[in-house]
């Protein structure tokens, strides 16, 4: 057995492959008579019996196998699955518990299924194999036929007359240089992995990504559809010329071309819709006809010219004719080098005809390079030979009249032109510009030169029809792949396939309509330049794709075709762009305009595809280089940015915290959502990233496994980030349930704050009256001890949401998006800043960053500071002057002289009641060894009378501040206040937490407690 298109032989495989253990439970296994590697229920295997495994020991470990890397399955057998690390490292009979951060692999998710259904599928007949082509029939012949188009027979002699043999060779070689480089780049891209259907679009999109790939795919499909019209018009021109020679005219020359063209395109549509097998047979027939016409032409150049042919300008090989035709003879509005190049270049654009049917090739990675390069070589040789031979045999101008001969007795003094040397006088038609023959005037010059003219007509028919047919097949194939990727709206309808080969019949009809529209132009010299820029644009992108993939140094760029150069590819891309503007600058602008429009649309929509493109590799490379470069830059206060580590747990459980920090850091600095797992399974990390992306929050997600919350957060504080791009501010939710939760949880919570201070972090604590937990959160596990609510530290976010395994039937749709107070526009409210202690300026900087966002732009910022009644105005002016130097734009400053007054007794009693649970009572009968100090060492969260007395002033200050907040900021949108700091060893953790609680209690607006790391984050200096 052989897998289609990959060349991997599976002769040693049996009809049925085993299934490895899934979720620790292995299916029944053993040797099924085929001698294969099997897994058993006990997790063991028989790799040593009848297996290809390079070991003699029983093991679940599997030897290297093709199935482990393939994305597709072979009909008639189940695909093998590589064992996971969990299956290798855990005995499922002894230990069914998965590690907390365990995530099932794709292979394990595939492992389930009904065995009866699988056996039934195995007995079904395999689907019929569609026809596949090798490199000769599938690529080389197809490319040669597409290159040998209408230009070869009908315009190459005319181009030779205009540009001369010398410049015609330059045009041919320049075109071949561009197509040759593009062929090398195409070969490199096509051999960098298994190629599927879609041709040029597939190659570019999988290399550069959907943004550029989609735009070029659409343009290339359109260019091929227009090329159908170009080749069809060439065929119709020949038919109408033959009709006129025989006195047959339907309407007039232009309308005759239109009628014949539409009929021809309709017939070609029928052949193409019959299937690739019939189309390929037709191409082989056309190829044989063209080869016969070439032989007929070469023989004709050798045969001596008859008087009838001499009258039309053919004199066989003459050195004088070669010399005269070697130099240019520009005529008409198209008479220029780039005018001729624009007309000739479409004849060289057929090099991608083979790549465009990559899905119909036996082995695209072999067929595309070999067939494409051979086609370029042989067609270039044929173009050079024909231009040289036609230029050496036929003069530029001839009348076609037998009466224009010169008798041997007559004088040739009044005769002008090269034909005078051969006793022919075409002077009159040359002077009057009425010559109808010669390579400058007669498009059918190759028929004139040939030994048998009808064979050249047959060659023209074969070349034009084969090229038109190839383009008629290429355009729908490319467009079908583009439709299946769903990058653009309203085009999916055309991607549906029919039959065993999934023929895109709807796309065929669309191509037919486009071709007919351009056939109605009925002017070959008008159609050819239109598509030149589109093909050049495609070639530029192919060359740039190869260069970009090479220059990023991605380990995934490993083309088996080695004969390419990244710098040569870059040169090819630049040449294509330059030539686009030299040919038709306005058409080049239109082409680039269309590309950039489609590029912008794709960037805006952000299609959910991941193809491992070189753009992704380049993004990584650039980010890595920038990160390394930042290590050489010293920190400066002017460049300070709050880079936030947000203890959200699963981000979907605390949307308010995510929204507030996301608003602070969006397009400004780093945001990282931290998640500590202490018990139970963790949700898949990709799910959280998807949720963040759908909420349009620019944040990273980082989950760690730890024995407890504090050690996990410590891991995040020390290990999060990269180089200088690492968090410097810790944000977390307030622990509302500290009074009813275990005292150890409160101690760990405050310990996290101290750990952050020790690591030089700024710290922010957010308290929202409604709590930070979403009302109906999706599946998630809460980090113990973060957030308010009567729940215990090990509860889940909501009883209706329990995390399940990925292998269950639960839908993997993205989590719902709960709303939060920070998602709404805040209107004309106020942001109240209580700048009571100087922490370096972080308390001022965060509200300033908020006011730069649209949601908060309408809010007025008020700054409250402490002061004395008798110096109130002086202190206000001092603070205003300082804030003005910071250039923050805050103009409303209020001095609060009453914050030093004693609080109300009722509030003091309420505070004491909140800490009574944690107080140590002094017993006079206790031994000194077991006194409060000894008990506090064992339980450091407990509060002694000495602690209360020592910290009484600070406690009363927090109670009084809450009363001030109730008076001044009841209607604010947000309150930002400097966080008090309790000294370790002096202020017990529960007392510190009680301060934070009483300071922010019973406030309707959200409260953000902020404490910087006591270093400047604001400066009024310019250096």
From Swiss-Prot:
Binding of ATP, residues: 647, 654, 676, 733, 772
Q: What membrane topology does the annotation report for this chain? A: Multi-pass membrane protein
So what does this one do?
Answer: Electroneutral sodium and chloride ion cotransporter, with a coupling ratio 1 Na(+):1 Cl(-). Mediates sodium and chloride reabsorption.
Species this protein is from: Pseudopleuronectes americanus (Winter flounder)
Q: Which residues cross the membrane?
A: 135-164, 165-186, 218-240, 253-277, 278-300, 336-357, 369-390, 453-476, 507-521, 527-543, 567-586, 587-598
**Which GO cellular component terms are attached?**
apical plasma membrane
For the region Scissor helix, give the residue spans: 614-629
- List the catalysed reactions: chloride(out) + Na(+)(out) = chloride(in) + Na(+)(in)
What positions does the entry give for Na(+) binding?
145, 148, 463, 466-467
Write down what this protein is called: Solute carrier family 12 member 3
What does the record list as GO biological process? cell volume homeostasis; chloride ion homeostasis; potassium ion homeostasis; potassium ion import across plasma membrane; sodium ion homeostasis
Q: Gene name?
A: slc12a3
User: Which residue ranges does the entry give as Cytoplasmic-facing topology?
Assistant: 1-134, 187-217, 358-368, 477-506, 544-566, 599-1023
């Amino acid at each position: 057995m052989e897998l289609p298109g990959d060349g991997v032989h599976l002769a040693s495989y049996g009809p049925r492959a085993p299934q490895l253990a899934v979720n620790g439970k292995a299916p029944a296994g053993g040797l099924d008579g085929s001698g294969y590697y099997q897994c058993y229920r006990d997790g063991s295997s028989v790799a040593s019996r009848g297996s290809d495994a390079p070991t003699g020991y029983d093991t679940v470990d599997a030897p290297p196998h093709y199935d482990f890397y393939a994305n597709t399955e072979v009909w008639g057998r189940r695909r093998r699955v590589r064992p996971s690390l969990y299956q290798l490292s855990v005995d499922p009979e002894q230990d069914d518990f998965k590690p907390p951060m365990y995530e099932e692999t794709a292979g394990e998710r595939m492992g389930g299924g009904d065995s009866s259904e699988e056996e039934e599928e195995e007995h079904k007949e395999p689907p019929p194999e569609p026809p596949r082509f090798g490199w000769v029939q599938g690529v080389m012949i197809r490319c040669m036929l597409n290159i040998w188009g209408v230009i070869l027979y009908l315009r190459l002699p005319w181009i030779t007359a205009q540009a001369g043999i010398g410049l015609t060779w330059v045009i041919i070689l320049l075109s071949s240089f561009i197509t040759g480089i593009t062929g090398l780049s195409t070969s490199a891209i096509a051999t960098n992995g298994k190629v599927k259907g879609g041709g040029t679009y597939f190659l570019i999109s999988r290399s550069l990504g959907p943004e550029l790939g989609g735009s070029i795919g659409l343009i290339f499909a359109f260019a091929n559809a227009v090329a159908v019209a170009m080749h069809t018009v060439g065929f119709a021109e020949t038919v109408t010329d033959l009709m006129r020679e025989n006195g047959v005219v339907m309407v007039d020359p232009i309308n005759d071309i239109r009628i014949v063209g539409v009929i021809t395109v309709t017939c070609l549509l029928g052949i193409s819709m019959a299937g690739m097998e019939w189309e390929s047979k037709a191409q082989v027939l056309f190829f044989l006809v063209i080869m016969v016409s070439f032989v007929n032409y070469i023989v004709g150049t050798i045969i001596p010219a008859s008087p009838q042919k001499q009258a039309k300008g053919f004199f066989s090989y003459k050195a004088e004719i070669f010399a005269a035709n070697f130099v240019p003879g520009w005529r008409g509005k198209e008479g220029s080098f780039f005018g001729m190049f624009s007309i000739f270049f479409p004849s060289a654009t057929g090099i991608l005809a083979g790549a465009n049917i990559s899905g119909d090739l036996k082995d695209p990675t072999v067929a595309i390079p070999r067939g494409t390069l051979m086609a370029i070589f042989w067609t270039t040789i044929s173009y050079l030979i024909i231009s040289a031979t036609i230029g050496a045999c036929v003069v530029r101008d001839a009348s076609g009249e037998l009466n224009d001969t010169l008798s041997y007795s007559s004088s040739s003094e009044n005769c002008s032109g090269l034909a005078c040397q051969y006793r022919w006088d075409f002077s009159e038609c040359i002077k009057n510009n009425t010559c109808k023959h010669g390579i400058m005037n007669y498009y059918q010059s190759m028929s004139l030169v040939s030994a048998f003219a009808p064979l050249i007509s047959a060659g023209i028919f074969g070349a034009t029809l084969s090229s038109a047919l190839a383009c008629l097949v290429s355009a729908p194939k490319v467009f079908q792949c583009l439709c299946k990727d769903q990058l653009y709206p309203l085009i999916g309808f055309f991607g549906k396939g029919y039959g065993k080969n999934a023929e895109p019949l709807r796309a065929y009809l669309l191509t037919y309509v486009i071709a007919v529209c351009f056939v109605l132009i009925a002017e070959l010299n008008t159609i050819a330049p239109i598509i030149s820029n589109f093909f050049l644009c495609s070639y530029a992108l192919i060359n740039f794709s190869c260069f970009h993939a090479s220059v990023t140094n991605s380990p995934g760029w490993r083309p088996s075709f080695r004969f390419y150069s990244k710098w040569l590819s870059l040169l090819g891309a630049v040449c294509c762009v330059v030539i686009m503007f030299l040919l038709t600058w306005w058409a080049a602008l239109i082409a680039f305009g269309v590309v950039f429009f489609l590029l912008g649309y794709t960037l805006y929509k952000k299609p959910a595809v991941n193809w491992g493109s070189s753009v992704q590799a380049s993004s990584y490379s650039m980010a890595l280089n920038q990160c390394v470069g930042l290590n050489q830059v010293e920190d400066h206060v002017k460049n300070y940015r709050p880079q936030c580590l947000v203890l959200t747990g699963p981000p979907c459980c605390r949307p308010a915290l995510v929204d507030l920090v996301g608003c602070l850091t969006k397009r400004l600095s780093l945001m990282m959502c931290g998640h500590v797992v202490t018990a139970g399974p963790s949700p898949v990390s990709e799910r959280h990233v998807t949720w963040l992306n759908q909420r349009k929050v620019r944040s990273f997600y980082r989950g760690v496994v730890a024995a407890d919350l504090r050690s996990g957060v410590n891991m995040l504080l020390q290990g999060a980030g990269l180089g200088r791009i690492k968090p410097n501010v810790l944000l977390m939710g307030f622990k509302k349930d500290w009074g009813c939760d275990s005292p150890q949880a409160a101690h760990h919570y405050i310990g996290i704050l101290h750990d952050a201070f020790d690591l030089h972090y700024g710290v922010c604590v957010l308290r929202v009256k409604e709590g930070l937990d979403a009302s109906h959160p999706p599946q998630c596990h809460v980090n113990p001890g973060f957030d308010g609510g009567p729940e215990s530290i090990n509860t889940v976010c909501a009883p209706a949401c329990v995390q399940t395994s990925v292998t269950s039937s639960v839908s993997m749709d993205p989590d719902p998006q709960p709303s939060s107070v920070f998602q709404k526009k805040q209107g004309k409210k106020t942001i109240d800043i209580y700048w009571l202690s100087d922490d370096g300026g972080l308390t001022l900087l965060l509200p300033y960053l908020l006011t730069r966002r649209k949601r908060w732009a309408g809010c007025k910022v008020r700054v409250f500071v402490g002061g004395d009644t008798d110096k109130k105005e002086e202190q206000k002016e001092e603070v205003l002057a300082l804030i003005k130097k910071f250039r923050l734009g805050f103009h409303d400053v209020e001095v609060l002289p009453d914050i030093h007054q004693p609080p109300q007794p009722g509030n003091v009693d309420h505070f004491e009641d909140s800490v009574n649970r944690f107080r140590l009572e002094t017993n006079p009968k206790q031994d000194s060894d077991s006194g409060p100090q000894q008990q506090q060492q064992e339980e450091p969260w407990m509060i002694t009378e000495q602690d209360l007395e020592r910290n009484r002033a600070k406690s009363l200050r927090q109670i009084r501040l809450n009363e001030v907040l109730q008076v001044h900021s009841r209607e604010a949108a947000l309150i930002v206040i400097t966080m008090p700091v309790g000294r370790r060893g002096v202020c017990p953790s529960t007392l510190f937490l009680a301060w934070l609680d009483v300071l922010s209690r019973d406030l309707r607006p959200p409260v953000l407690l902020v404490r910087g790391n006591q270093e400047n984050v604001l400066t009024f200096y310019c250096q």
